[in-house]
Amino acid sequence: MVRGGLSVCYDEFLTPREQLQTENVHMRKIRISRQSVESSSNFQEKWLDLEAISVAEVTSEDPNFPIESALTEKGQRSGWRAAETGEQVIRVVFDRPTPLHRIRLEFSDTETERTQEFLLRWGRMGEPPREIVRQQWTFSPHGSTSEVEDYRVQLDDVSIVELRLKPDLRPEHGVASLAAWRMA
């Protein structure tokens, strides 16, 4: 705009809100139906069939809560529980090196107040394991009774994934449990 022989930028006289309203923005957009939204929200990750492609190793197992009920979607979904107190280790050893892009852990305790710590590691054949995450969570029967951790990872040629559980950081050393462990 020209005023009194001077070139003046019109935007200098507009408030930031007015500037946004006058900008010529061309956003690409597509109108979608409610049915397509509902079907996409029901999308579920294609989890690995760990029973078919790996061996599970555990330091302890309550016969009523076997590791396969935490690692697979088949049968009862009671999760895994240790038969002994104290730190426990669960390993998933793949038959062949496998790429992973997602790891999901679910823990649940509605009965005991405790602070749990877990360490999740992975390794390639012949190499030392590498830490993915170490985390603590406090369970409380009247508050936080479940923990869900969903990790996006970029891991190639994975031979082993290991979960180390300290079920209770207090001296009592509670019983470790795992509701579900999925990988994709």
Give a label for each model feature.
Residues E23-D95, S108-T112:
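Disordered, acidic Ser/Thr/Pro-rich linker "stalks" and the adjacent N-terminal cap
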Residues I90-P99, R152-D157:
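Extracellular and analogous surface-interaction loops
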Residues T98, E113-T115, D156, P171:
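A cross-taxa feature marking solvent-exposed loop/turn segments within ectodomains of secreted
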Residues T98-T110, L163:
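A short beta-strand element within beta-rich, extracytoplasmic domains
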Residues E113-G126:
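Short, surface-exposed beta-strand/strand-loop-strand elements in extracellular ectodomains
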Residues R130-V153:
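Extracellular carbohydrate recognition and processing domains
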Residues L163-E172:
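Short beta-strand-plus-loop segments that form exposed binding edges in beta-rich domains
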